[in-house]
Amino acid sequence: GEIRFVETKFLSKLDNEIANNFREVVFEDKVYFNKTKINTQINFKMAKFKNNVEFVNLHNNVSFNNVNFKGIVNFENLNINTLNFKNVIFNNIVSFDNIRFDNNCKPNFENCTFSDQFNIEHKYIEYKFDEIEKTQEYDKLLNYRDLFRKLKSNRIAHHNLIDASELRAQELYARELELKHKENKSLKEKIERWQLVFYRKLCDHHTDLLLNLKWLVVVIGLFALLYFASRMIQDISLLKALNQYGVCLSIVGVFNLLCLYWFGCIKKFDFFVYLNLIVVLWVICYMPKIIFGIVNIIGDKSYNGFENALITIYTILLALVLFSLQKTARKNSIVPS
């Protein structure tokens, strides 16, 4: 029949002979844990739950190892340190409602299978690149990638494409770090690693449109600045053609940016972006056609070797950034069907 553990106390400690152990236990009917007090941790290694399970108001460590959940599993009002799942099969709906972890921890899922809806607040399965980067072990990085791949597939199956795209980015974080720590990489794997680095920096794997726009400004601004410097070296009189009011406004803008950066109001990369934005505004006002790069090569005007190389490199980079920009704008298109 149904089993209920209500306000039950598991008082054994790590040095006790009796452990809080449900090893290889088969629960045929519903199981309910509510306001259960556990001194150390409770272990469900190789247990089988053939019906619905509820864990409510738990306040300690819980581990599930080689467990098979046949029915619905619900974790509710948890306030615990760690929640570990290893080689666990969820055959039905899994729900985490109102859970809190001490020390900003997250539930740990290793080699788990999710066959139905997996309902959990996204922040508990969201990992930034810096968080994953702390992991130096190759096998753990493989586990991360496997987890993100399975959760991504689960989100796609239930039409949550926004979370799926973010999990796809996390999967690529793990793949990049996996390749970084892998020994004896092939040439193809080396290229793949740097490709992943490039797209992470450019647009966070097509999930950050603003970051992509910033790089567009940087590419155009740097090209215009180098092109103008090359022309000015050949003909210093070009400076006289610049609008004096525009020059004054630009100087004021640069000074303000320096102050904002000095006092920590903007980050280094944003400071660099805003400087290039000033250059882009000059380009729009005076010579917008150079934005299109390759048009200048087939024009009538002659260019020296440096300028030809600069325009060619710029055109390639601009094409990559614009391609990434349109793909990022159609955010859901990056999720595999």
Residue ranges and their predicted role:
Residues 1-337:
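Terminal module of membrane-associated proteins
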